[in-house]
Amino acid sequence: MKKALITGINGQDGSYLSELLLSKGYEVHGIVRRHSVAENQDKRLVKNGTSDKVTTHYGDLMDYPSLARVVSTVMPDEIYNLGAMSHVRISFDMPSFTIQTNALGVLNMLEVYRTICPNAKFYQASSSEMFGNSVDEDGVQRLTTPMNPVSPYGCSKVMGYNLVRHYRHAYKLHA
C-alpha cells in the first residue's frame, strides 16, 4: 500500500486530496499544527468522512525537527506540500510570516525529503498569484506566461517554485 504525507491536510485542497488518495487505496498521513487543529477541529476531514481514516501528526513547516520526525516515522512514497499562509490580502500585513512559511517552509520540506526519503515523489502546490497581472497576448495566463507576482504571497509562491525546481535538478529528485 502506498503511503502519502500531506501538509495542509486541514485545508480545502488537503482534505479533498486525502479523500481521493484514500479512495485509491493509499495510507494517508497529514501534518497538522496544534493551533490549526484547535481552530479547525478537523472540520473538513470530518465533513468528507476521512477523519477516522487519516493519521495526523503534529508538525510545522517552520520547525525542521518536527518535519524530520514525521517523515522518518511515516516514510512516505509521496509528499504533497499544500501547507501555506494562503491569504493574499493578509500577506501585505504579514509579509515576513508569509515568506517564512511559504518559502522557507518549502525549503525545510525539501531538505527533509532529500535527506530522509529521496526516492519519494514530491508535489508543491502553486498559485495563479505567481503570475500576478501578467497575461499572454490573448489575455490568458499559461505556464509560459512570465511570472510577475504583485503580492508577498505571490512572491513567496515563486520562491517555493524555484526552490523545488532547483532541488529537482541539483539533487535529481522526483519533485
Over which residues does each language-model region extend?
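N-terminal Rossmann-like NAD(P)+-binding domain of SDR-like oxidoreductases, especially those catalyzing
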Residues: M1-A175
